């Protein structure tokens, strides 16, 4: 199937490798070479322009500094009952601040995958960038060797919690909810690529990093690997390869040349996960089907086989025409030649059109509504 965006109502345990030096910014002139770490571990990312204005971290204006004692009290001394999740980076706890605000507190493992540089990059990035589809950083803690990040609490967890290994009593996401999540995630990337100046390359887009609020509106999280994109005559940023296996664009994995089109490939993988309900890498699948992109390639090329890609949990309740559009978008995002992949602005237009068509289809079929039911948010303290 072929499709052009101009037809769609156009408008104007994760595996990571070591992080390199973040891009230093002096009027956006950059030396991307790696010469080892500096003595402070500080990343210079100030001076990002948003809507023509310089955004910079202002003391007292944005993310606040917490003491370790405050965060220990918020989590009741990091009790297991408040544990939301854990990984190679450390643990995430649910907490309640003195103000009564419920938050998510990420306590980094000093020996984990997220190092001091990544911590600083994340604090700076989320202090500079603000959008409805980016998670809000409330504050941080740097007491002694402790490194903690305090985020707004997202009651429905991550996208992967609702796509993979569902509990027997857990209702699968409806088609329309999946499209809503796709549109929101794309808008978040569009903000990073098109509004921030220079553009920000997310570099770690995956279902685990897409958090969901109570209305299933998505927010991108975990900006420790984000990097400022190329400016001027530069076409790419050269960097050590990093990210998550199964999501990385092939040209980036091979050469370390990073562009905004690297994020587009990652987005294609996430969109494929949304359609199929399968993980980017699933060692539980039989040989030849463990890599989602590799497994899907033959089906993406044959419209008659598109149905084989659809998550069985949808039970056939999706508009066939909208599926065709979605797979066309996926195929373009996953093009092995980076310059043939669409820009995120075009993807947003296409997905907004697709989501609108999906809603119209549902409205015409109100006699057989989606099996979507209300879901129970994560437990309170």
From Swiss-Prot:
Pfam families in UniProt: PK_Tyr_Ser-Thr
BP GO annotations: defense response
The protein's enzyme class: transferase
Membrane disposition: Lipid-anchor
EC number(s) on file: 2.7.11.1
Active-site residue numbers: 204
InterPro entries: Kinase-like_dom_sf, Prot_kinase_dom, Protein_kinase_ATP_BS, Ser-Thr/Tyr_kinase_cat_dom, Ser/Thr_kinase_AS
Keyword annotations: ATP-binding, Cell membrane, Kinase, Lipoprotein, Membrane, Nucleotide-binding, Palmitate, Plant defense, Serine/threonine-protein kinase, Transferase
Residues annotated to bind ATP: 84-92, 106
Chain positions covered by the region annotation Disordered: 362-381
Domain Protein kinase: from-to ranges: 78-354
Domain of life: Eukaryota
Subcellular location: Cell membrane
Single GO MF descriptor: protein serine kinase activity
Mod. after translation: Palmitoylation at Cys-3 and Cys-7 are required for plasma membrane location.
Annotated catalysed reactions: L-seryl-[protein] + ATP = O-phospho-L-seryl-[protein] + ADP + H(+); L-threonyl-[protein] + ATP = O-phospho-L-threonyl-[protein] + ADP + H(+)
Lipid group attachment sites (S-palmitoyl cysteine): 3
CC terms in the record's Gene Ontology section: plasma membrane
Function statement: May be involved in plant defense signaling.
Protein family (similarity comment): Belongs to the protein kinase superfamily. Ser/Thr protein kinase family.
UniProt-recorded name of the protein: Probable serine/threonine-protein kinase PBL21
Naturally occurring in which organism (per UniProt): Arabidopsis thaliana (Mouse-ear cress)
């Amino acid at each position: 199937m072929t499709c052009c965006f101009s037809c769609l109502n156009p408008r104007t345990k994760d595996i990571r490798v070591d992080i390199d030096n973040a891009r230093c910014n002096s009027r956006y002139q950059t030396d991307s070479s790696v010469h080892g770490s500096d003595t402070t571990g500080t990343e210079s990312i100030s001076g990002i322009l948003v809507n023509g204005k310089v955004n910079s971290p202002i003391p007292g204006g944005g993310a606040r500094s917490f003491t370790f004692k405050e965060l220990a009290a918020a989590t009741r001394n990091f009790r297991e009952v408040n544990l939301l999740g854990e990984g190679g980076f450390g643990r995430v706890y649910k907490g309640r601040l003195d103000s009564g605000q419920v938050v998510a507190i990420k306590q980094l493992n000093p020996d984990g995958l997220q190092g001091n540089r990544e911590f600083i990059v994340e604090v700076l990035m989320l202090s500079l960038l603000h959008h409805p589809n980016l998670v809000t950083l409330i504050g941080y803690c740097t007491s002694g060797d402790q490194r903690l990040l305090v985020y707004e609490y997202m009651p429905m967890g991550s996208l992967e919690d609702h796509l993979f290994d569902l509990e027997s009593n857990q209702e699968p996401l409806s088609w329309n909810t999946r499209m809503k999540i796709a549109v929101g995630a794309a808008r978040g990337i569009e903000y990073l690529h098109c509004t921030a100046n220079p553009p920000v390359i997310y570099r770690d887009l995956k279902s685990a990093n897409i958090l969901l609020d109570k209305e299933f509106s998505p927010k991108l999280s975990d900006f420790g690997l984000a990097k400022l994109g190329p400016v001027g005559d530069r076409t790419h940023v050269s960097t050590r390869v990093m990210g998550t296996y199964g999501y990385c664009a092939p040209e980036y994995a091979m050469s370390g040349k990073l562009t905004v089109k690297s994020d587009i490939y990652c987005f294609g993988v996430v969109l494929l996960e949304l359609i199929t309900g399968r993980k980017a890498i699933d060692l539980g699948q039989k040989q030849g089907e463990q890599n989602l992109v590799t497994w899907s390639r033959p089906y993406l090329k044959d419209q008659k086989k598109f149905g084989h890609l659809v998550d069985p949990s949808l039970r056939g309740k999706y508009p066939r025409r909208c599926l065709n559009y979605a797979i066309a978008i996926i195929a373009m995002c996953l093009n092995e030649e980076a310059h043939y992949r669409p820009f995120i602005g075009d993807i947003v237009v296409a997905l907004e059109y697709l989501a609108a068509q999906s809603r119209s289809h549902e409205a015409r079929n109100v006699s057989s509504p989606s099996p979507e039911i209300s879901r129970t948010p994560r437990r309170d303290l």
